[in-house]
Design a protein with these regions (language model features):
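A structural microfeature
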Residues: 112-116, 242-243, 254
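CN hydrolase (nitrilase-like) catalytic-core segments centered on the catalytic cysteine
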Residues: 62-85, 154, 163-252
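Active-site-proximal beta-strand elements of phosphoester/diester hydrolases
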Residues: 2-13, 119-120, 153-162, 181
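Hydrophobic residues at beta-strand termini and immediately following loops
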Residues: 8, 118, 148, 213, ...
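Short beta-strand scaffold segments in enzyme catalytic cores
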Residues: 86-87, 100-104, 146-148, 232-234, ...
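A conserved C-terminal secondary-structure "cap"
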Residues: 261-282
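Active-site catalytic loop in hydrolytic enzyme cores
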Residues: 75, 92-175, 188-197, 201, ...
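Cys-nucleophile CN-hydrolase/nitrilase-fold catalytic domain and related Cys-dependent amidase chemistry
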Residues: 17, 22, 26-112, 117-119, ...
Length: 282
C-alpha cells in the first residue's frame, strides 16, 4: 500500500497570529490537492518561537486542546480528507500547565485521541536550541508517549528535541508505531548531514518511517531573530531518504510516497530491534 505523506515546510511565523494560521491552512490545502493523505506541520506551527524571552507576554497565545485552533484544523482535516498533525502551544485547564504539544485529526476531522497526541518530553536549555533559549521556563514536560491510528498506519510523534533521544524511538516501536512524525522549529546552524542522518539512523535501527516538518527562514520575536533551516524530510523504515526539502528551496510542500507494506519486510531483513539484548538493557 503506497500512501502519500506530506510535510509543510512553513515560512517563519510573524507576530500576526491570524496570518500565521492562514499560511498553515493554505499549506494543508496545497498538500491535499497534491494527493497527500497525511500532513505534518512544524513545531509551533502558527506561532513564532518565543523561548528566548520571558514567558509572561506569551501566555495569552496558549489554547486548550479543544480550543478555537483545534476546531479550525479539525474542520480543515474533514474538508481536505487528510490526517493533520498540528503542533500548538497548549494550556491545560485541568493542571494549569503549559505544554509544547501536538494535536492530531483523522481525515474525518475527528481527534485521534482525547487531548494532544504528544507533549514535548525533553525541554532543552543551553546550546540546543541556541544559547539564551530556555524551554523549561515556558513549558512543562510531557510524561507519556502515544501511538494513534490514521490512514492505516500507527503513528507516534516526537517533538523537535525529543528526536535526540534513542530511547524515545525505541519506545514508540515497542508501542507499535509504523511512522514517527517529527515537528521541528530548527535553528542555530545544525549540521544538515547530521540533522537528517540522525533521523535516518533512528529510522533504520527501529524499522520506523519518519516524516519531519521544519520551518524555514527568519522569525522575529521579542527583538530577536530565529533563523529556521528547513530540511524537512521523509525517510523510509530502512533509513532511505524518500524526499528532502533543503533550505534553498524555501517554504513549500514536501511530498513522498510511503510504501506501508514494505515496513514489515524491512523489519524482517534488518533485525536490530528484535536482536537487541533485553537481558542486558532496560
Amino acid at each position: 500500500m503506497s500512501l502519500a505523506i506530506a510535510a509543510a515546510q512553513l515560512p517563519g511565523c510573524t507576530m500576526d497570529l491570524a496570518a500565521n494560521v492562514g499560511v498553515a491552512e493554505a499549506a494543508v490545502r496545497d498538500a491535499a490537492r497534491r494527493g497527500a493523505r497525511i500532513v505534518a506541520l512544524p513545531e509551533m506551527a502558527t506561532l513564532p518561537y518565543f523561548c528566548g524571552d520571558a514567558p509572561g507576554p506569551y501566555r495569552a497565545w496558549a489554547e486548550a486542546a479543544d480550543g478555537p485552533l483545534a476546531h479550525r484544523f479539525s474542520a480543515l482535516a474533514a474538508e481536505t480528507g487528510t490526517a493533520v498533525f498540528l503542533p500548538f502551544y497548549e494550556r491545560d485547564a485541568a493542571t494549569g500547565r503549559y505544554h509544547n504539544a501536538v494535536l492530531g485529526f483523522g481525515p474525518d476531522g475527528v481527534a485521534l485521541r482525547r487531548g494532544p497526541v504528544a507533549r514535548k518530553l525533553h525541554l532543552p536549555v543551553g546550546d540546543d536550541p541556541p544559547p539564551g533559549f530556555d524551554e523549561r521556563a515556558h513549558f512543562a514536560a510531557g510524561d507519556a508517549l502515544h501511538v494513534v491510528e490514521a490512514c492505516g498506519l500507527r503513528i507516534g510523534v516526537l517533538v523537535c528535541y525529543d528526536r535526540r533521544f534513542p530511547e524515545a524511538w525505541r519506545a514508540l516501536r515497542r508501542l507499535g508505531a509504523d511512522l514517527v512524525i517529527v515537528p521541528v522549529a530548527g535553528s542555530g546552524g545544525d549540521d544538515m548531514d547530521f540533522f537528517v542522518g540522525e533521523m535516518r539512523t533512528h529510522a533504520r535501527e527501529n524499522g520506523l518511517a519518519v516524516l519531519c516538518a521544519n520551518k524555514v527562514g527568519d522569525e522575529y520575536v521579542g527583538g530577536g531573530i530565529v533563523d529556521n533551516y528547513g530540511y524537512s524530510a521523509a525517510i523510509g523504515a530502512d533509513g532511505a531518504v524518500l524526499a528532502l526539502r533543503p533550505r534553498q528551496e524555501g517554504p513549500g510542500i514536501l511530498l513522498a510516497d510511503l510504501d506501508a507494506a514494505a515496513i514489515p519486510e524491512v523489519r524482517r531483513r534488518l533485525r536490530y530491534y528484535d536482536d537487541r539484548r533485553q537481558d542486558l538493557f532496560a
